[in-house]
Amino acid sequence: MTAALHLPAKEYEYRRKIKTREELRGIIGGFPRAKKVIMCHGAFDLVHPGHVRHLLYAKSKADLLVASLTCDAWIQKSEFRPFVPQDLRAMNLAALEVVDFVVIDENATPIDNIRYLQPDYFAKGYEYRDGHIPPKTQEEIDTLSAYGGEMLFTPGDVVFSSSKFIERCRPNLRNEKLATLMDSEGLTYDALRQALDRFRGLRVHVIGDTIIDSYVFCAPISSGSSKTPTLSVRFERQTDYAGGAAVVAKHLRAAGAEVIFSTVLGNDDMKEFILKDMAKCGIECRPVIDPTRVTTQKTAFIANSYRLLKYDRVDNRPIVGKVLDELQETFATSQADGFVFSDFRHGIFNRATIPSLTERLPKGALRVADSQVASRWGNILEFQGFDLITPNEREARFALADQDSVIRPMALELYKRAGCKLLILKLGERGTLTYRWASDDVRAFFTLDSFAEDVVDPVGAGDALLAYATLSLVAGRGPVVASILGSVVAGIACEHDGNWQVTPGEIGERIDALEKLTRFE
């Protein structure tokens, strides 16, 4: 049993209408035929009243109505398209009584399928009939005329734009998209639970920049008659958290993995804090101590839930010479199953050190990289040929120097140029987009909506995703499980303040809830 929406069997009978073009050709036969066939083609991302009227009119002109839809790979009309994955779009059309058959067109235009299926009629919307025939429409007319088919234009008294609907108010199809993806991949919710069980005991080595995230909670003091705009607050308490690459290590450990952490620290109080924190979590820390630098600490001053000021204590000089050599020695002979480069650009990673650090990674182990663009300029493209990279949209656009392309073509370009095996592009509240191979195959990429319910603090959610996606791949569970579990964990992390370590128990509860929702329980 797969993860499809668990409706009664009779409610799912309409799925029999969805055919490959070869199956459809065998059913409708060649041209000419006794029963007339009319074909409509489009994205059908959101089926609205304009679509319904178009389909109803088309069906009135023939015996059989074939709804052809553009596959995901060729929809590049706007930022959020396609909003509904192709399998779910096909199911939506098949559920309409007026539609006899549905076919997913894997080509950029319907020309090839018109030539192959040879419908008696091909229906176009009224907006195309304005006295000027676009070149693409003329090509369709010529293809139809070559065997005796005809073009029909449907009445256009009701016209809607799916793109405008989606951009203004996107409906929540998170659960439906998840269930459709799992169904197409033959995945069950039990498979997700089993993946979590496999994480215990896996060995992962994290190499990266340590950051101490400090929160100083204050109470505002009235400025009284002060003649200067001086901000005055009273100290109440301070809370310190391990951040940066250290929190990635803690996420991995919370999932049950055996974790080694290599980093560079200053010889100061914050060094002692991070070493104690790692030991408390059961993480083996292999620090390189550089007495000439400070341990990175980023402090936020908070009063009445407002962040008044951020103060950074940091040394961004690139590591060189002895420090670089010592850091490489901490992982060169490591027996870990996977290695994570967590780059915050605070000295360890740069254009000069990355090739050297990458070369020292043990052969055959899984290689993962994440490079952040925040106060510093990391470039994910400097990590070439890795098994997994997890940039966010800003980091991807920075690496490509591309501010303008819509998401999916931009993601594909990044995937190709990075030479990686798997790209999980983080899109914030819009979820994730995953590329698993660079081709025109419709399964080359897939999307997931955000799983966050009540967002409290999204900072650090990407680190949680990175950790669980890494463990999924180390456990041999594949890109779909890696993306789903990573996205679920990121959603949970958003619901907590600070660097919260999500546990497998919390993830299991969220998976249970998702399964109930898709079963309509």
Predicted regions and their residues:
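Nucleotidyltransferase catalytic core that binds NTPs
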Residues: M1-S184
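Short, glycine-rich nucleotide/cofactor-binding loops
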Residues: M39-H51, I207, V233-A242, G347-I348
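Glycine-rich phosphate/adenosyl-contacting loop at the front of the ribokinase-like
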Residues: A179-I260, D449-V456, R519-E521
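Conserved phosphate/ATP/ADP-binding segment of small-molecule kinases
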Residues: R193, G338, R351-F445
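Substrate-binding N-lobe of the ribokinase-like
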Residues: L202, T230-T296, R510-A513
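Conserved phosphate-binding/catalytic loop of the ribokinase/pfkB sugar-kinase fold
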Residues: P287-R293, A300-S334
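Short acidic, glycine-rich surface-loop motifs adjacent to enzyme active sites
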Residues: A336-N350
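Conserved post-catalytic alpha-helical subdomain immediately downstream of the catalytic base
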Residues: A418-L422, F451-E515
